UniProtKB/Swiss-Prot annotation:
Protein residues bound to GTP: D56, I57, R58, N59
Protein origin, superkingdom: Bacteria
UniProt keyword terms in alphabetical order: ATP-binding, GTP-binding, Nucleotide-binding
Gene3D superfamilies listed in its UniProt record: P-loop containing nucleotide triphosphate hydrolases
Stated name of the protein: Nucleotide-binding protein VSAL_I0495
Family, per entry: Belongs to the RapZ-like family.
HAMAP family (alphabetical): RapZ_like
Length: 284
């Protein structure tokens, strides 16, 4: 029996995650109190069906160490994976404003604004997030995108095959929270300053041709490939189910997109399971 524990910030997509897990054959329990988690797992430990449990801000113990200790003990004798869903504050506020729903911290008596409730919840859950096996930033994801990402990550974990995720981003939009490695490519020649290339992206051939004329672009790409190829066997031996590599430039439109696409295609050719995402392009 596999146990998935799903948590995260309210509005980040926990209900979507549970629906995906249910579709994958998991028996799902929503908002189980933490002090009943160990007892519940013990009661179904001989079941052949995989189980998913969501942990909500409303049923967390006042002592955060209780949840950590409970999960530590469960992992000693069970196959446990903790998934944490996150999103930027402004996106969570937007989602609540659009649905006109009350934040859970407002429902349990906290006298605070929506913005304060989001900030307070993040501070309460920060330690749980640090201990999660899989952290997903859902800021720019539609329900469909989140469902597909969760499905591929969960199936990848179950098959014990390492999934390599390459994502481009713009530093002006902030660092991705789910990255294992971040490479800054802002020092490379910038197509933005070429008027004909400015409206294009790193996926367009004229931009690729421009970048490939510069030796430092090719050198950096090959050095990142070599670094990842060198340490990939060790990462796979460490029982990781995914590896997220983020490439950032200023706006996330040209240089980072090109390098990310090139890396993803290279590792696909090496037979790796690869996902490629362009965070800034997905915003538009």
């Amino acid at each position: 029996m596999k146990l998935m524990v799903v948590s995260g910030n309210s509005g980040a997509g926990k209900s979507v995650a549970l629906r995906v897990l249910e579709d994958l054959g998991y028996y799902c329990v929503d908002n189980l109190p933490v002090d009943l988690l160990a007892q519940f797992v013990e009661s179904i430990q001989h079941s052949s069906q995989n189980v998913a449990v969501s942990v909500d801000i409303r049923n967390l113990p006042k002592d955060p160490s209780l949840l950590k200790n409970t999960l530590t003990e469960l992992k000693k004798s069970h196959d446990v994976t903790v998934i944490f869903l996150d999103a930027e504050d402004k996106e969570l506020i937007k989602r609540y404003s659009e649905t006109r729903r009350l934040h859970p911290l407002s429902l349990i008596g906290e006298q605070c604004s929506l913005e304060q409730a989001v900030e307070l919840e993040k501070s309460i859950l920060c330690h749980f997030k640090e201990d999660a096996d899989l952290v997903l930033d859902t800021t720019s994801k539609s329900i469909h995108d989140l469902s597909e990402t969760l499905r591929s990550r969960i199936l990848g974990r179950e098959s014990k095959e390492l999934v390599m995720v390459f994502e481009s981003f713009g530093f002006k939009h902030g660092l991705p929270t789910d990255a294992d490695y971040v490479f800054d490519v802002r020092f490379l020649p910038n197509p933005h300053w070429e008027p004909t290339l400015r409206p294009m992206t790193g996926l367009d051939k004229p931009v690729a041709d421009y970048l490939e004329k510069h030796a430092e672009v090719i050198q950096l790409k090959e050095q990142i490939q070599h670094f990842l190829m060198t340490w990939l066997p060790a990462l796979e031996k460490n029982n990781r189910s995914y590896l997220t590599v983020a490439i950032g430039c200023t706006g996330g439109q040209h240089r980072s997109v090109y390098i990310t696409q090139q890396l993803g295609e290279y590792f696909k050719q090496q037979g790796q399971q690869v996902q490629i995402r362009h965070k800034t392009l997905e915003r538009h």
